[in-house]
Amino acid sequence: MAKYEIMLVVRGDLDQEQANKVANELKATLKNTEVKENNYEGVQQLAYEINKLKTAYRYVYNFETTDVSLINEFRRLAIINKNVLRHIIINLEKDYGYKATVNAKKVQRNEKRAEVYVRQKEEAERRAAERQAAYEAMKAEREAAGLPVKEFVKGANSKR
């Protein structure tokens, strides 16, 4: 069985009963599926206006099915319905982000990459501290010798 996630964005100018009715009508097309999770995320501000609307109701459904025609029917009805502003259907088994959290090899590879990144960051910080200490020592040496000390301004001495 393939795992899917659907996010549905319904017009915000409807009252909650009407929005729930729209979402439930579309969800009814997903009969013969095993619904894992059914989230109503409430009225939310949109990042940008869609059809001159600034708010919308968001619904998220997670389910498993083997029948792709149900997904196609849901997509068709969501496009036809004028109260649905946006929808997205994600096959979680083909989604690389999902695979990276489930596949043991990819998890191990990502952990190694994270370790390398942390080591590189620590090495860069250590080198920066060494450069700062060398600069402070040079500055103290020049002051002790009575020579003028040029203040170090980050980026001022670099060639462009």
From Swiss-Prot:
GO terms for molecular function: rRNA binding; structural constituent of ribosome. The keyword Transcription regulation does not apply. Keywords: Ribonucleoprotein, Ribosomal protein, RNA-binding, rRNA-binding. The gene is rpsF. GO terms for cellular component: ribonucleoprotein complex; ribosome. The lineage of its organism: Bacteria, Bacillati, Mycoplasmatota, Mycoplasmoidales, Mycoplasmoidaceae. Belongs to the bacterial ribosomal protein bS6 family. GO terms for biological process: translation. Disulfide bonds: none annotated. Gene3D superfamilies: 3.30.70.60. CDD domains: bS6. Binds together with bS18 to 16S ribosomal RNA. This is Small ribosomal subunit protein bS6. Pfam families: Ribosomal_S6. The keyword Amino-acid biosynthesis does not apply. InterPro entries: Ribosomal_bS6, Ribosomal_bS6_sf, Ribosomal_S6_plastid/chlpt, Transl_elong_EF1B/ribsomal_bS6.
